[in-house]
């Protein structure tokens, strides 16, 4: 499985900039930020596995409107169905669709994952193509997939 650390790289660069922008925009936030200089709002991401593009999107879809704890539980169940690893797009497509429901995905999220998997398998989506796109192009491309909206696409 290839590795795509792109989302984490962006977060590492964006956090200091975002923190400084918030400090300048709001004196109350400035005091809170100054009182906690080591606070990293996205530190929870450090515990997440680094996945390829498809795996990252599976995680993103799983987390739509759910807590981090619920998302992790669903992903853990999914990985158990696939021998302890995140399935590739081809593995997910080859599996019984009920595996997604048994893992905790809603029917709609299952349809979204299968549509994503089809695009990765047939080449309409790839890690390389997504990495070469601008953020706006990534968002436009991913939101063509039913069930992927701007929130999920921007999180990628």
Summary of predicted features, one role per range:
Residues 1-133, 137:
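N-terminal polyanion-binding entry modules of DNA glycosylases/AP lyases
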Residues 62, 134-156:
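Catalytic DNA-binding helix-loop module of base-excision-repair DNA glycosylases/AP lyases
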């Amino acid at each position: 499985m290839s590795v795509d650390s792109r989302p984490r790289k962006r977060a590492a660069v964006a956090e200091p900039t975002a923190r400084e922008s918030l400090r300048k925009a709001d004196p109350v936030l400035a005091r809170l930020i100054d009182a906690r200089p080591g606070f990293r709002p996205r530190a929870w991401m450090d515990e997440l596995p680094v996945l390829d593009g498809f795996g990252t999107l599976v995680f993103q879809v799983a987390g739509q409107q759910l807590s981090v704890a619920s998302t992790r539980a669903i992903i853990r169940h999914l990985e158990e169905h696939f021998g302890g690893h995140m399935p590739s797009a081809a593995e997910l497509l080859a599996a019984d669709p009920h595996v997604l429901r048994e893992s905790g995905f809603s029917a709609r999220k299952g349809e979204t994952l299968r549509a994503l998997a089809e695009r990765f398998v047939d080449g309409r989506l790839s890690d390389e193509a997504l990495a070469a796109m601008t953020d706006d192009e990534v968002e436009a491309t991913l939101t063509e997939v039913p069930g992927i909206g701007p929130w999920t696409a921007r999180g990628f």
